[in-house]
């Protein structure tokens, strides 16, 4: 990936709330299926904003920090997805999204961020990201000392 897009907690929360607005009225939903791990964060925001208490997970391993590998389903919610929102932080190449679509064909699949290759596979998202851009999510970052410019 040649570019990086750094997301702060404030930005993420704002975008996740915007996604929640698009999912109203809340009465149409039975619950949320969060794609672990990136989808756990927007799932918490959606659950709060939509007043939903039923939150399931689907655990699919595909990344090792910035390298995408083979998909491995570790755990899946036992439903066809009817009445459920499936949420992930990002749709990138679409590999994970295709697997999720097969598992939950009746769910509404949403993400906060979408890259061009994966965007057609989700029902809704908030922010377009160029395909060659790596997203640094706030849960992957820490706060550290930065030396003054004069010391570099």
Curated annotation (Swiss-Prot):
EC numbers on record: 2.4.2.-, 2.4.2.22
Keywords: Cell inner membrane, Cell membrane, Glycosyltransferase, Magnesium, Membrane, Metal-binding, Purine salvage, Transferase
Cellular component annotations (GO), alphabetically ordered: cytosol; plasma membrane
Principal location class: membrane
Catalytic activity: GMP + diphosphate = guanine + 5-phospho-alpha-D-ribose 1-diphosphate; XMP + diphosphate = xanthine + 5-phospho-alpha-D-ribose 1-diphosphate; IMP + diphosphate = hypoxanthine + 5-phospho-alpha-D-ribose 1-diphosphate
Domain of life: Bacteria
Assembly description: Homotetramer.
Molecular function as annotated in GO: guanine phosphoribosyltransferase activity; hypoxanthine phosphoribosyltransferase activity; magnesium ion binding; xanthine phosphoribosyltransferase activity
Annotated positions binding 5-phospho-alpha-D-ribose 1-diphosphate: 37-38, 88-96
Family assignment from sequence similarity: Belongs to the purine/pyrimidine phosphoribosyltransferase family. XGPT subfamily.
Biological process annotations from GO: GMP salvage; IMP salvage; purine ribonucleoside salvage; XMP salvage
Protein name as it appears in the record: Xanthine-guanine phosphoribosyltransferase
Record-listed guanine binding positions: 92, 135
Pfam families assigned to the protein according to its UniProt record, in alphabetical order: Pribosyltran (PF00156)
Positions annotated to bind GMP: 92-96, 134-135
Annotated Mg(2+) binding sites: 89
């Amino acid at each position: 990936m040649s570019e990086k897009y750094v997301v702060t907690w404030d930005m993420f929360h704002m975008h996740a709330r915007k996604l929640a607005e698009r999912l109203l009225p809340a009465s149409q939903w039975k619950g949320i299926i969060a794609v672990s791990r990136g989808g756990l964060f927007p799932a918490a925001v959606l659950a709060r904003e939509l007043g939903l208490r039923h939150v399931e997970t689907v655990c699919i391993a595909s990344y090792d920090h910035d390298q995408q590998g083979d998909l491995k389903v570790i755990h899946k919610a036992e439903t066809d997805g009817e009445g459920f929102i499936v949420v992930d932080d990002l749709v990138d190449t679409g590999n994970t999204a295709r697997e999720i679509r097969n598992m939950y064909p009746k769910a509404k699949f949403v993400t906060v961020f979408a890259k061009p290759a994966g965007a057609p596979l989700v029902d809704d998202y908030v922010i377009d990201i160029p395909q060659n851009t790596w997203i640094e999510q706030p849960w992957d970052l820490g706060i550290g000392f930065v030396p003054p410019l004069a010391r570099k």
